[in-house]
Amino acid sequence: MPPTIEVPVLVVGGSLVGMSSAMLLGHYGVRSMVVEHHRGTAIHPRAAQITQRTMEIFRTVGVEQIVQRKSSEQFVQDGAIMGVETLAGKEVAYYIANLNEGIRDLSSCERVFISQSLLEPLLKQRAEELGAELRFATEMISFEQDGAGITAQIRHRDSGDTATVRARYMIAADGAHSRVRERLGIRMLGHGAFSNSITI
């Protein structure tokens, strides 16, 4: 049986929240392991608007400028968000006429548009530079919590190889339908989805 892998923090989920967590931990000298069931970073645009507070955090960990550069390859920096009936149809409303209107009075960082498929690789690279161990195509299949931390079983989706991970802390970054949160009995409250949208 392979030896137990010991790491201060196990991050379950390697999308925007998981990668950002790993970057911040690494920035402050804390090692982490990220397990993500997908085989790589996002391949679809998905989320696109990054707030100025997030950009302030990205500045702290050294990725603000590269995120801005990558964003400017795709989007107008002070662009708008609008609603339409169809791609060629009637304009319904402008939700935001200028993404950064008033923002420069509040922060030295700006909001940006950048598709998730472009952002995740940037966060992945920085997390690795700061010492995170990233395991894609890997899922957490179970965990037990005690007074000193957690013991988790992880499995590679392709090979079927399993390993035991012992961590002082675990971050549940596995999305809106989090299995970790469900296992811990943490419920989501609220009205649920307000709308559906597609980033193009």
Give the residues covered by each predicted segment.
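A conserved short coil-to-beta-strand element within the FAD-binding core of flavoproteins
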Residues: 136-151
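N-terminal Rossmann-like FAD-binding beta1-loop-alpha1 element of flavoenzymes
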Residues: 4-34
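Flavin (primarily FAD) binding-site architecture
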Residues: 172-186
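Conserved phosphate-binding and hydrolysis motifs of nucleotide-dependent enzymes
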Residues: 13-18, 168, 174-175
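Central beta-strand plus flanking loop segment that forms part of the substrate or channel wall
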Residues: 65, 116-118, 184-200
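Core beta-strand elements of the Rossmann-like FAD/NAD(P) dinucleotide-binding domain
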Residues: 5-7, 159-169
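Active-site-adjacent segment of FAD-dependent monooxygenases/related oxidoreductases
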Residues: 43-47, 51-128, 144
